[in-house]
């Protein structure tokens, strides 16, 4: 899928960016010892992508959290379908949820749109390929999501192959 250390660094950076010195709202609203169960459900029909990334965000923030995937990457989900459950410290769940949801929503969106294009060209002798035009730091996730949607990866980075464009022929 991807080098473990790359995903770990991406998640740590995302959590550091969002949490900073701490989640002041959760700290003010909770005692800190509450436990709970969170459920992630699909708000619309979609193609799942990034479900393990979603879980890894919670586990990175708090290894004691228990994550259970209910759908796998590449599967279709209908509106209201259960995608995953997270149980444990309510403070940890609330602190990690926005980063986890942002990554999951982005990846599912890419996979869903890719699948729509792949379905449109079914039966033709062509493939849907991605590009390097991704948000900095999120390329591994974006390209993974394309594959989950049935598309193919082109070049991962500049080192990955020669592609002469008009900018090179000046």
Specify the residue positions occupied by each region the protein language model found.
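Acidic/glycine-rich phosphate/pyrophosphate-binding loops and surrounding catalytic core
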Residues: 1-170
């Amino acid at each position: 899928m991807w080098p473990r250390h790359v995903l770990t660094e991406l998640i740590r950076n995302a959590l550091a960016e969002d949490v900073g010195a701490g989640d002041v709202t959760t700290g003010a609203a909770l005692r800190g010892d509450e436990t709970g169960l969170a459920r992630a459900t699909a708000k619309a029909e979609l193609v799942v992508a990034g479900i393990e990334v979603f879980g890894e965000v919670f586990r990175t923030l708090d290894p004691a959290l228990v994550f259970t995937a209910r759908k796998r990457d590449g599967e279709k989900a209908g509106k209201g379908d259960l995608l995953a459950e997270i149980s444990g410290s309510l403070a940890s769940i609330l602190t990690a949820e926005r980063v986890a949801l942002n990554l999951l929503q982005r990846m599912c969106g890419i996979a869903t749109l890719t699948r729509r294009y792949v379905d449109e060209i079914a039966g033709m002798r062509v493939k849907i390929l991605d590009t390097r035009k991704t948000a900095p730091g999120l390329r591994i996730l974006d390209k993974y999501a394309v594959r989950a949607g049935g598309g193919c990866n082109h070049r991962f980075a500049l080192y990955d192959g020669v592609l002469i464009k008009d900018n090179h022929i000046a």
